[in-house]
Amino acid sequence: MDFTKSGIPGFSVTDSFADVKQRLDIVRAGNDFGFESVMGYLPLDGKRYLMGATQNPMTYDIDSVELRELFKGDTFEGIALGEMSAQEFAGELAKIGSVPIMEDTGIWWPAERVCFYVYEDVPSTICWWGKDPIVDEVKTIFSGKIGELDLNVYHLYKAEE
């Protein structure tokens, strides 16, 4: 499956939370942190992907959509997932969009409002963010104000020499 900047085929962060919730084979729904969230399986292209969505408690729009448990052969904008290190993957993203912001646990692609969570130095989860994120740190990342972040944790992608 080739995932894109705009989201999961058939889903968008501009969809209503209720519509997204209806399309999942729900494993867990909750109101953990004062906002609603749901996690469930989404059948796509003959596979069952684990997908989560959180709701913005102020606007009731989708805050984020997350896709876990990627499969061999999955790609993002044509870039192979699971076959390269986080640094190499960030380099490929930089070729087709904004310069990623790196941290130990993730790759943030600010202009595209996408992040990739990293497990054992390999991108393993894709997360698309809505227009009004609720977490201040995420707001800062997507505003492009990296100087306001802890520079011991975050840094702009730079090609290895």
Role assignments for model-derived ranges:
Residues 37-43, 47-57:
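Conserved short beta-strand elements that form part of the metal-binding/catalytic scaffold
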